[in-house]
Amino acid sequence: MSKTQILHISDTHLGKRQYNLDFREQDVYDTFSQLIDIAIKEHVDGIIHTGDLFDINDPPNKAEIVAIRELKRLKEAGIPFIVIAGDHDSPKKFTAIYPQKILEEFDLIKFLSKPDTPYKLGEITIYGISHVPNVAKERLKELLSRLKPENKKSILLLHQGLKEVLPYEGAWQIQIDDLPKAFSYYALGHFHTRRVFQLDGGRIIEIAGSPDILREEEIEGYEKEGKGATLIDFSGDIPTIQKINIDVRKQYVVTLNTNNLREEIRKLREKYDTNNEKKPIFHIILEGKSIPKNVLMKELQEINNFAPYWRIYKDNTKEKDEKDVKIDLPTDTTIENLIYNYLVKIANFSETEARMIVDIINRADEREYVKEELMKMIGVENDNKKN
């Protein structure tokens, strides 16, 4: 019995610059290179790519150069690269062409541009339909109904929204019942998190996912399923699959409480600062009391010492209107008590920090204008001020 293995990859999005960062664009190229390394190392019989090879229809020169360089490695190893287009790299204008056509012109890929014309890889027949938008979903269903593979060992490549995965109006074009039943394997792109559906008769729907974390919503899926490619073994009558993970830059959604921000950042560094060459990205959820933006950003700058990029993902801090804040003061209050109460109850300093500031002030020059300015700052006029 001959052993036939195919590597399924998808949604590589070459040219993608997450948050417009140079190093994130390079990360995307590095993950693609890792996938090619896997294909060569595993001596696979072919690679199938289910759409969004490029992030846009008119990719930057660097993305095309990376694609050409890596696909030449595959060609030299005798491994065919069979591909369809996704919604990102499909033409948006009638006069535009698929970037895959350029690669096919140099005999680097096999672009499945005709649904009824399969590619034969040994005893396996591979069909493919590039992304079809919502406005033409009835036409897509008609195309699917007409597909009849020549043999049992057959693969259908698609890049579509599937209702069972994304059941929102306008987000899907087909559902599982729309798939032609004669295929043994359905390889899907478009979704960035891995997923597998086992159907009757040993049929499999498999979503390879994107090989890198391209949106913060993918982090949870990455932590559960990893990122990389799927190795499909067609040696038996029923295909079997194996996930192969690759090394990607980690991203985390973390919660920081502004009530004790410095300590929170210290713990964050202690937990995530590693010797890994690819430092992580943080998506920060803020909790606690609202603090002045300049104070907040100054504190958060500390994260730059152990992460190349961070962003405030959600701000759940509670706003406090200083005009509505009232401090109950005893009749015999002192300037020190006024300052202390302001620092703790309005400026959100800790009690320790407030005492330290008051102590510093007490050790400073006792000139009258210092007290006057401090009293203005906290909104208390000096009734004893001499005119």
UniProtKB/Swiss-Prot annotation:
Instruction: Name the EC number(s).
Output: 3.1.-.-
Which BP terms in the Gene Ontology apply to this protein? Answer: double-strand break repair
The answer to whether UniProt assigns keyword RNA-binding to this entry is no
Active-site residues are H88 (proton donor)
Q: Cofactor: bound how, per the entry note?
A: Binds 2 manganese ions per subunit.
Binding of Mn(2+) 2 occurs at: D52, D87, H159, H190
Q: Which UniProt keywords apply?
A: DNA damage, DNA repair, Endonuclease, Exonuclease, Hydrolase, Manganese, Metal-binding, Nuclease
Q: Which family does it belong to?
A: Belongs to the MRE11/RAD32 family.
HAMAP family assigned to the protein according to its UniProt record, in alphabetical order = Mre11
How does the record describe its quaternary structure? Homodimer. Forms a heterotetramer composed of two Mre11 subunits and two Rad50 subunits. Interacts with HerA.
- Output this protein's name: DNA double-strand break repair protein Mre11
